[in-house]
């Protein structure tokens, strides 16, 4: 099961990604994690990426696609994988297709901008693990503390309103066109496109996903 998640920052992708990973036993492939791992391991692509980053440039699609190709060839991706944060642009989606990566499902989480801004303000993060909570929608068992370690949760700079609105602007400009792109791919029978109402409760959205993927 090869899945791409689409949705604005704060639409609930991360929470549902964890659900899908646990439920179906497939790894989440995050381009950020992949880049860090390749740089740390000193692979050929990692060295190229490091040189670009050190020069203050953005890593090219070519390098990212190369990393994805290496990553999905690993044993844990045998049953499939979940792509989160990639593709972000039409050229990246084309690159994935040209590489021969078939996508079984494209899942979109639909949430209005104002709802996202309100949501982000309530987010709390456990930085060492990357686990995230929300004071209203997905509270920790103990207020302000991580469920697993009991350590303090923090509000990330990313979750402040002006930052959120700026990121939403970028999303609408760059990534929203992928909704049309994958809609057409689905019409052509190349993938299945699933759209979920991201304003519903976390458990409800998870149940909807499970039903759709059954």
UniProtKB/Swiss-Prot annotation:
Q: Report the subcellular localization.
A: Cytoplasm
Could you name the domain of life of the organism this protein comes from?
Bacteria
Q: Provide the alphabetized UniProt keywords.
A: ATP-binding, Cytoplasm, Kinase, Nucleotide biosynthesis, Nucleotide-binding, Transferase
For this record, an example GO cellular component is: cytoplasm
Which GO molecular function, any one, fits this protein according to its record? adenylate kinase activity
**Oligomeric form and interacting partners:** Monomer.
Quoted from the entry, the domain comment is: Consists of three domains, a large central CORE domain and two small peripheral domains, NMPbind and LID, which undergo movements during catalysis. The LID domain closes over the site of phosphoryl transfer upon ATP binding. Assembling and dissambling the active center during each catalytic cycle provides an effective means to prevent ATP hydrolysis.
- Designated name of the protein: Adenylate kinase
Species of provenance:
Vibrio campbellii (strain ATCC BAA-1116)
Organism lineage reads as: Bacteria, Pseudomonadati, Pseudomonadota, Gammaproteobacteria, Vibrionales
